[in-house]
A protein has these predicted regions:
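Histidine-/acidic-rich catalytic cores in large beta-rich domains
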Residues: 1-194
Length: 194
């Protein structure tokens, strides 16, 4: 079982955060506590473990001895997002990032929205072994904003940023294209990598 805290903001000031691996009896196999904020500790098919470090805004990969052997970050001025990383068989990595457009008038979709809102989209990147971006897709490049669950505003976010897409995961499909899960769209989107 791979464990990382999800919401460290509820911890008292000065608290340590942890990530751990425990066996099916609950006995710790690996653990570390630090002031850093960790997310999404997981094992990949190539045997590497990855986790997201929220302070560094990047992913780290560890070998079977829990030694950091690589790190992954987004290019083109974006910061990696904590929601997912996929390590591909060719040594490349798929990463998510957020992309904000400020000062957008979204009142045609949400009548009571502020005249100037910030719309948060998602960026999907594939980086090669040398950390070069070889694929870059922006949800906000579609030319218009999609109707999403955020438009219903169930949480009263109209005074804050509008998180149009909120991507949670990505995966390669059998055709080699990217499958993106978008929570606020209630959809799974297939992205052509060609």
């Amino acid at each position: 079982l791979f464990l990382t805290p999800f919401n460290s903001s509820t911890l008292p000031s000065g608290s340590l955060n942890s990530m751990a691996i425990v066996n099916d009896s609950g006995q710790p196999i690996y653990g570390v506590s630090t002031y850093a904020v960790f997310h999404d500790l997981k094992l990949h098919a190539n045997g590497l473990l990855t986790y997201f470090d929220a302070w560094d805004r990047m992913w780290y990969a560890m070998d079977s001895n829990y030694v950091i052997v690589d790190s992954f970050w987004c290019g083109n001025g974006y910061f990696a997002d904590m929601h997912d990383i996929q390590l591909l068989p060719n040594g490349h990595a798929l990463l998510l990032a957020c992309d904000t457009v400020r000062g957008v008038d979204i009142r045609q979709w949400i009548g009571n929205a502020p005249q100037q809102s910030n719309v948060i989209g998602v960026v999907v990147q594939e980086i090669d072994r040398n950390k070069n971006v070889i694929f870059n897709w922006r949800s906000l490049d579609s030319g218009g904003y999609k109707v999403s669950d955020m438009i219903e505003d169930p949480y009263g976010y109209l005074e804050a940023d509008i998180d149009e897409i909120h991507a949670n995961s990505l995966q390669l499909d059998a055709d080699g294209n990217i499958i993106l899960s978008a929570r606020h769209l209630d959809e799974v989107t297939k992205l052509d990598r060609n």
